């Protein structure tokens, strides 16, 4: 049975991770695993791998990189975060704290935005309340499948 609740971006959400296909997926080239929805894992993990190699290394052992979390959007009761559907990740959160601006070097921001766009993601650093650690799927299931094929991404493990 499909969950009837949805996260902010319209993807199915549930407290039961198995119900929406949330699992731990390895980020290629790192020791990190992210908990995210299987349907979007190639995009989120592919992005995280390129982020690690091109923007900054993902911290190993600092526990500041994550995906799935069943919760509301901060300060917006009743609106489920995209973390609740396994379609959002936070990377290096101890370096890029919620509300802080300019946590990335100016030269990194254009590449960061281009990478996010390449993978069909929105970057929280562009929001009115900046969340520079945050990246979320901004396209629907059909476009996700199409983009995974176009980018030649393998099914995440």
Per-range role (PLM):
Residues 42-87:
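Active-site-adjacent loop/helix surface patches within enzyme catalytic domains
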Residues 27-31, 75, 96:
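Generic preference for well-ordered secondary structure
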Residues 1-58:
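Active-site acidic/histidine clusters and adjacent loop/turn architecture
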